[in-house]
A protein has these predicted regions:
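N-terminal helix-turn-helix DNA-binding core of bacterial DNA-binding proteins
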Residues: 3-47
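Amphipathic alpha-helical dimerization/coiled-coil segments
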Residues: 82-105
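Beta-hairpin "wing" of winged helix-turn-helix
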Residues: 56-69, 75
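Intrinsically disordered, low-complexity serine/threonine- and proline-rich regulatory segments
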Residues: 1-7, 91-94
Length: 105
């Protein structure tokens, strides 16, 4: 079980974890996020690598071996999957609340 609080993930962390269901290197993560969000999010390298370091420190992702030693690949851990599942549930609850209580004039 993750040893963190249940605070919301940042949008950056959410999309990185969502992207890392299979091992990917940094540039592929950026491209995947751009694709998932239909171009709405175009993440810069500084943002990506800062977030990767933070997620790695929390043990939500790990660096994995890859064929090309000049590239670092990352993959989500079981703790990362649990955190992602909780975030998806939180977002679903928010959407349900909006659909129930938001009234357009």
């Amino acid at each position: 079980m993750p040893t963190t609080n249940t605070s919301a993930l940042t949008e950056t962390a959410y999309y990185i974890l969502l992207s890392l269901q299979t091992p990917l290197h940094g540039y592929a993560i950026m491209q995947n996020i751009k694709s998932i969000t239909n171009g709405r999010i175009s993440m810069g390298a500084g943002t990506l690598y800062g977030a990767l370091n933070a997620l790695n420190e929390k043990k939500y992702i790990v660096e994995c071996e890859c064929d090309d030693p000049s590239r670092r690949e990352y993959v989500i851990t079981n703790d990362g999957k649990e955190v992602l599942k909780k975030e998806i549930s939180r977002l679903e609850e928010m959407l349900q609340n909006a659909q129930t209580y938001f009234k357009e004039d």
